[in-house]
From Swiss-Prot:
It comes from Pongo abelii (Sumatran orangutan). This is Acyl-CoA synthetase short-chain family member 3, mitochondrial. GO terms for biological process: lipid metabolic process. PANTHER family: ACYL-COA SYNTHETASE (PTHR43347), ACYL-COA SYNTHETASE SHORT-CHAIN FAMILY MEMBER 3, MITOCHONDRIAL (PTHR43347:SF3). Catalyzes the synthesis of acetyl-CoA from short-chain fatty acids. Propionate is the preferred substrate but can also utilize acetate and butyrate with a much lower affinity. The modification N6-succinyllysine is found at residue 518. CDD domains: PrpE.
Length: 686
């Protein structure tokens, strides 16, 4: 039940789950801002299946939406916000009082947990499946309805409140890929607590720095994380982090995983999850202001203070709900799978909050693309659960291809409900893209975004009629709200197909970060000082004549070869397109004549019989044909594996340091740190 005083004040969308029937008059947040922008589709909202079904793929609807989002963002996002339920209407849709940060839906009050769970139950969807938990590492499969999720989340919210957590307090979540991690996120959102979810298994030193920075009253953890072939003991890692650091939380809530030994509790500090839940009282949703932080998510950063991205509640809810239909083309009720980790922004946005806000079924997968048990794992999950759309990283596809080049394991599964494969997290080379299309037999769409934005910056907006067969190598067009431009270092706009700095003209749309936790100076300096009036993505790329954006590399990964700026990503793309190399990373090696020359670290495909010398000769010739002699590419070192972060990114700065014989730091997000030693050894032998 909601507090009674709120019931008559709740503003609900037209056409969304929980809204009045199409044709009824929706309540208004700020009347002028909420007038209908375009003729609504069959569900009365922006985008969605109705728009997609009528689309010819010409993108005319996309063009209308993008233009409206740029010329009149207040009206555009005001309309989208009607699909979210509000306790109190906003007085102003957009405000730039604290530039460069933009405030959205000023003075509006809402609750994300209510929008993600309660409202679906109130509108007769309580028995629909909210979460499918698929854990090959524990041989467990389970489903949870929206009603069952609400029961767990509301009780857990009661546990947190009982132990002193109130609106505005911080909670650190340090858990594996289990439903209880999502329950904790939602329980925090329910009571207005700010969660900071940190990868389960994260090293104690890094965990300690984040605990010291966010100063949680409570840490929520689990007894073990399960990796292929091993268990990770979480509680000793937490204990070590607390010894290293200064801050001590009041309580540690521990979930003991079933069928494993229980961990001992520290008297007076530790709480047993099951015992607390057994005696818990359910807790209602607490309204929060639109700008209230929903979570703090730490991202890779520079030296100094950790870089904790602050996510504002209202704009995030609006953007995620809108994106599920307009970008990803899903109807409520369809099954969605973001094959990521909850610790990444993809996990926050598109395992937990996005699909639940939109009334979808979300797959929570505790496994890997290969090795749990084999390269057919993704195909099994897609077939077994009737997944409509999958979101994964190109590195996962490359891993599957390397293990099973012909996808023999995948071909045994029928993917009748599977419609679209979205990839992001790193550049998707054309070779991987084409292989994916041939194997999965669905459109494969690359798109691009960042932890800071919380949702895509560029994409093929399926729900708005964008082409499902865009040119190879692109990452989509500017998502409505993101006015993307390519500038040189002097802030001059570049012509089509000229490599430059990718920036976004302000204001940033709803859902983008509102700051860095306890570090607003860095927020302004890092993102907004170099190009005043723009958000600096710190990525390099270009835009073609049709508006497709090609993200080539981080600005730092542009290699200066004798005065020519060469994208490392372009060379990688060329190498991978040859077909003999399964994975590669290109870095700049210092050269006394040219300044830098590109060096490739390559992983050969398993089915290649040629010698390394033959392959090197071939790929050098191939790069020369594709990019030209200006790239000065002549050298490659062959390794058995490349180091990757858990989200599939290659740590190029560390590899560049190794190649140039300089000290380097192994960050705690690296999946297997031992690979660095292997790379060093191969470089010595080369």
């Amino acid at each position: 039940m909601k507090p009674s005083w709120l019931q008559c004040h709740k503003v609900t969308s037209a056409g969304g789950l929980g809204g009045p029937l199409p044709g009824s008059s929706p309540a208004r947040g700020a009347s002028a801002a909420l007038r209908a922008l375009v003729v609504p589709g069959p569900r009365g909202g922006l985008g969605g299946r109705g728009c997609r079904a009528l689309s010819s793929g010409s993108g005319s609807e996309y063009k209308t939406h993008f233009a409206a989002s740029v010329t009149d963002p207040e009206r555009f996002w005001g309309k989208a916000a009607e699909q979210i339920s509000w306790y109190k209407p906003w007085t102003k849709t957009l405000e730039n009082k604290h530039s460069p940060s933009t405030s959205w839906f000023v003075e509006g009050m809402l609750n994300v947990c209510y929008n993600a769970v309660d409202r679906h139950i109130e509108n007769g969807k309580g028995d629909k499946i909210a979460i499918i938990y698929d854990s090959p590492v524990t041989n467990t499969k389970a489903t949870f309805t929206y009603k069952e999720v609400l029961e767990q989340v509301s009780k857990l919210a009661g546990v947190l409140v009982k132990h002193g957590i109130k609106k505005g307090d911080t909670v650190v979540i340090y858990m594996p890929m289990i439903p209880q991690a999502m329950y904790t996120m939602l329980a925090c959102a329910r009571i207005g607590a700010i969660h900071s979810l940190i990868f389960g298994g994260f090293a104690s030193k890094e965990l300690s720095s984040r605990i010291d920075h966010v100063k949680p009253k409570v840490v929520v953890t689990a007894s073990f994380g399960i990796e292929p072939g091993r268990r990770v003991e979480y509680v000793p890692l937490v204990e070590e982090a607390l010894k290293i650091g200064q801050h001590k939380p009041d309580k540690i809530l521990i979930y003991n995983r079933p069928n494993m030994e229980a961990v001992p509790l520290a008297p007076g500090r530790d709480l047993d999850w099951d015992e607390e839940m057994a005696k818990a009282q359910s807790h209602d949703c607490v309204p929060v202001l639109s700008e209230h932080p929903l979570y703090i998510l730490y991202t890779s950063g520079t030296t100094g203070l950790p870089k904790g991205v602050i996510r504002p509640t209202g704009g995030y809810a609006v953007m995620l709900n809108w994106s599920m239909s307009s970008i990803y083309g899903l109807q409520p009720g369809e099954v969605w799978w973001a094959a990521s980790d909850l610790g990444w922004v993809v996990g926050h946005s598109y395992i937990c909050y996005g699909p639940l806000l939109h009334g979808n079924t979300t797959v929570l997968y505790e496994g890997k693309p290969v090795g749990t048990p084999d390269a057919g794992a993704y195909f099994r999950v897609l077939a077994e659960h009737g997944v409509a759309a999958l979101f994964t990283a190109p590195t996962a596809i490359r891993a599957i291809r390397q293990q099973d080049p012909g996808a023999a394991l995948g071909k045994q599964y029928s993917l009748t409900r599977f419609k679209t494969l979205f990839v992001a997290g790193e550049r998707c080379d054309v070779e991987t893209l084409e292989w994916s299309k041939n194997v999965f037999r669905v459109p494969v769409l690359d798109h691009w975004w960042q932890t800071e934005t919380g949702s895509p910056i560029t994409a093929s907006c399926v729900g708005l009629g964008n082409s499902k067969t865009p040119p190879p190598g692109q990452a989509g067009k500017s998502v409505p709200g993101y006015n993307v431009m390519i500038l040189d270092d002097n802030m001059q706009k570049l012509k089509a197909r000229c490599l430059g700095n990718i920036v976004v003209k302000l204001p940033l749309p709803p859902g983008a970060f509102s700051g860095l936790w306890k570090n607003q100076e860095a927020f302004k300096h890092l993102y907004f000082e170099k190009f005043p009036g723009y958000y600096d993505t710190m990525d390099a790329g270009y835009m073609d004549e049709e508006g497709y954006v090609y993200v080539m590399s981080r600005v730092d990964d542009v290699i200066n070869v004798a005065g020519h700026r060469i994208s490392a990503g372009a060379i990688e793309e060329s190498i991978l397109s040859h077909g003999t190399v399964a994975d590669c990373a290109v870095v700049g090696k210092e050269d006394p004549l040219k300044g830098h020359v590109p060096l490739a670290l390559c992983v050969l495909r398993k089915d290649i019989n040629a010698t390394e010398e033959q392959v090197l000769e071939e790929i050098v010739k191939h790069v020369r044909q594709n990019i030209g002699p200006v790239a000065a590419f002549r050298n490659a070192v062959f390794v058995k594996q490349l180091p990757k972060t858990r989200s599939g990114k290659i740590p190029r700065s560390a590899l560049s340091a190794i190649v140039n014989g300089k000290p380097y730091k192994i960050t705690s997000t690296i999946e297997d740190p031992s690979i660095f030693g292997h790379v060093e050894e191969m470089l010595k032998q080369a």
